[in-house]
Amino acid sequence: MRLNIFDVEHGACAILSDGYGKVSVIDCGHNATTGWLPGSYLRNQGITDVQGLIVTNYDEDHVSGIRNLFQQTNVHRIYRNMAVSPGLVRYIKSETGMGPGIDFLVSSAQQSSGYGTVGYADMGMHGIEFEVFHNLPSEFDDENNL
């Protein structure tokens, strides 16, 4: 197993590899200064399939490279906070403005009922298991904690 954490200035992006050719992406921010994008990076490494995209919160800097990730790779599943509906994200973001990455994520979530999970999840990666938890919208005022 290998975890690469990338410099995306503000935000987050990490790629988890099982050592057998399967990867998952934890957040998909990009680096505006260098032009680094997660999907282009993976494609340049010869990786075209992403087992899962794990979105840790609904801030733009955590998903600013999502469109590139979807354009350059086949993302099999998105794991996100399922307690937060796409409509609620749009409502919360109406106060501060919704960036293109969040808009893409919300649109993808609206088109698929099969994304996300709570509890133990199997991404089909050798030797890697993870458990998903989420915060409830009623417990927080901002999307950074959702």
Mark where each language-model region is:
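Conserved glycine-bearing catalytic or ligand-binding loops at nucleotide- and phosphate-handling centers
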Residues: 89-123
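Metal-dependent catalytic neighborhoods of phosphoester/phosphodiester hydrolases
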Residues: 63-72, 88-98
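Active-site metal-binding motif and surrounding structural segment of the metallo-beta-lactamase
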Residues: 19-24, 33-83
